[in-house]
């Protein structure tokens, strides 16, 4: 079986496929095991640090896996590792920001390996702009989900993207008119992806997760967006250590399946625009 690195030797860069000349290299890893892609990230991170490669982004779907981040208090498994292994779900401890999350086919993950000093040359030494970088990832996710008909929002203090939960049409409520007005506001703003709303976590479902790490100004790890994956994998964890959080996907929100290859193409265009 070929490794991810060997597969990618013969895989064209997505920016080239789109006919775009860009200093950003975007590599489609297809469906790949998490541990293999993690090893590839480490290799590319060192090459980027030495200046041997340009800024690079890996786009991938993972086989079922649960990852635990560096924030131990946010790492909450609701099943034993033995039980998860029987269900063919790998569990990996990694050194990235955030807590527990899950990946599986139908979820689109992208890992930017970027030199933050070159991405933001005006920043003084020692100030790598991690907060600005995370906001940029969130902006990319918002714009991608807008293309799929999903209005995603930021939540201050909770990295990632969230979708507001609306009441069902037949549910009686004294504030039904307010909900209708809120829906109209969201619909009217959905064509303006540059306006990224801050939402209330108590009335939202999470659709995208972010966990990053920066070493010697080089980024790795990244963002996972639920497109049309099986959300039942999240029943085995407390996502990001937040009790009561519900997960959602573009499929759950719209009821429509999409072409993952087309979503990857749209993501590639956004990455080039934001990071080139």
Which role fits each region the language model picked out?
Residues 2-202, 257-258:
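N-terminal lobe of the biotin/lipoate ligase/transferase fold
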Residues 87, 205-210:
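Short beta-strand or tight-loop elements
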């Amino acid at each position: 079986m070929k490794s991810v690195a060997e597969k990618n030797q013969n895989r064209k860069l997505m920016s080239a496929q789109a006919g775009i000349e860009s200093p950003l290299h975007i590599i489609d890893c297809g469906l790949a095991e998490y541990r293999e892609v993690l090893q590839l990230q480490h290799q590319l991170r060192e090459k980027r640090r030495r200046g041997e490669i340009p800024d690079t982004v890996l786009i991938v779907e993972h086989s079922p896996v649960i990852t635990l981040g560096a924030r131990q208090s946010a790492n909450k498994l609701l099943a034993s590792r033995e039980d998860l292994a029987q269900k063919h779900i790998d569990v990996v401890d990694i050194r990235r920001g955030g807590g527990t999350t899950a990946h599986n086919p139908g979820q689109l993950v992208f890992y930017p390996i970027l030199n933050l000093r070159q991405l933001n040359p005006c920043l003084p030494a020692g100030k790598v702009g991690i907060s600005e970088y995370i906001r940029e990832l969130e902006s990319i996710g918002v714009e991608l989900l807008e293309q799929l008909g999903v209005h995603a929002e930021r939540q201050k203090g909770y990295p990632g993207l969230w979708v507001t939960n609306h009441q069902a049409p037949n549910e009686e409520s004294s504030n039904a008119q307010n909900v209708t007005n809120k829906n109209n506001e969201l619909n009217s703003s959905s064509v303006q992806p540059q306006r990224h709303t801050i939402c209330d976590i108590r009335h939202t479902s999470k659709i995208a997760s972010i966990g990053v790490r920066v070493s010697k100004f080089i980024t790795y790890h990244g963002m996972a967006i639920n497109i049309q994956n099986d959300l039942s994998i999240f029943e085995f964890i407390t996502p990001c250590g937040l009790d009561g959080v519900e997960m959602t996907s573009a499929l759950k929100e719209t009821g429509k399946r999409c072409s993952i290859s087309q979503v990857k193409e749209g993501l590639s265009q956004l990455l080039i625009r934001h990071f080139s």
